[in-house]
Amino acid sequence: MIVEFFKKLFVRKKKIDIKLLPSQGLFYKEDLVITITSASKNDIEDYEKNYIRDDIGVVIYYIKKIVERNITLSKGYKYEDIKSIDIIFIFLEIVKLTKGRPINLVYFDKNKDKDEKIEFGSKNFNYLRLGNLIEYYDYKHRCFVVDGYKYTLPSIGVENCLTNFLIIKSAEEDSGDYN
């Protein structure tokens, strides 16, 4: 009881506007609500201890782990339903909430021949530009329909299943068949 009281007191929460995610919420049902909480000290220590800058697989694994631990979805949804394209954005929102301040990302500006900073947020990052593709979007089914085929973005669940399949197959004797 006391632990829950202190959690409510110190753990920050924030509702994510799914229309500001890279997927723009186009592939989620209208009733989905995503709420994030600030990361725990254990989450941060685990991430920092195991972070390997040059191993993208490890980086993605720990990003997903932190998102899974610090996300609450409306009833009927689970972590695996989140679209893969949204995971990094949600992770950075968790970091921003945890730190209590904006995140500045450093990039190299070729025109100025120097490093520049840009504040992370939906105003500065536009991941999905639909253009003429929007004419194929089915608002009822929340997907694109082209020549009778429905298309949507892969979810974390699909991505994880495919990754696990490839890991298992790569360990088998005939793994060269999958390259």
Model-based region annotation:
Residues 1-179:
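Long C-terminal interaction/binding lobes of large macromolecular proteins
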